[in-house]
């Protein structure tokens, strides 16, 4: 009988890689070597984008809050400062959601911020 080097171990390792590469285009999902190289690149993108996701969402929330505040004659920075002075402790995610879904409630927050800034 011929000698078998890492027979079942290699098969399992290759199957695991090819399973993770499902959905990739062409040989990148069929051939082990191409799949492995693509997965290495995918891992770097995953690592980078887990961090970028936080930045991107914060930027989106700030844009939504700014748009809502400008509808009521205020810009983002004065609105946030007014909320801080008034002691309103809502994060940007919640503020953006209120601005998008509940304009009446956001109007109350804007009035609170204006009142706190004016003294």
UniProtKB/Swiss-Prot annotation:
InterPro entries hit by this protein: Ribosomal_bL20 (IPR005813), RIBOSOMAL_L20_CS (IPR049946), Ribosomal_protein_bL20_C (IPR035566)
Pfam families: Ribosomal_L20 (PF00453)
Function noted in UniProt: Binds directly to 23S ribosomal RNA and is necessary for the in vitro assembly process of the 50S ribosomal subunit. It is not involved in the protein synthesizing functions of that subunit.
GO biological process, one term: ribosomal large subunit assembly
UniProt keyword Phosphoprotein, yes or no: no
This protein's encoding gene: rplT
SUPFAM superfamilies: Ribosomal protein L20
Name used for this protein in its record: Large ribosomal subunit protein bL20
